[in-house]
Amino acid sequence: MGEFSAESATAIAAAGLSAFLCAAAAVWTVGLVVMDARERRLPDTLTLPVALTAVVACWFEPRGWVGLVWAAAYLIAGRGFGGGDVKLAVSLGVVLAIMGGVEAVLAGMLLASAFTAGFLLLRRAKTAPHGPSMLASAWIVGFASTFLLMV
């Protein structure tokens, strides 16, 4: 007892870093949801640095490149998606691709679309902020991917 190996220290540091990053992502998520719900925009100050970081991460984790499909789909669709949605799709797509591959990215895209469509139908609205749906779907799919990998 009392032995503390380098492996133990590394595991504790990794757990602490993971907890910090998860908390930071949660705070970022709340900020984006509130901003998009109130103002119908996702500001560059909250989306661009994270999107650029996600692209840089792809150089170190090549599985992330497939996540750019989400942003590409929004660029191709054009109408209905703002620049903030595209930048957010870069970040969320890369993270989901790293966590769960192309299946996670597609699940995130489909779930976000379903959430926004449901909001439009229930509210009988013609427009809706899409960022909250994207973020909710990314959290759900991210947790599901993590859980499924542990099983």
Q: What does each model-identified segment do?
A:
Residues M1-V151:
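A membrane-topology feature that recognizes alpha-helical transmembrane segments
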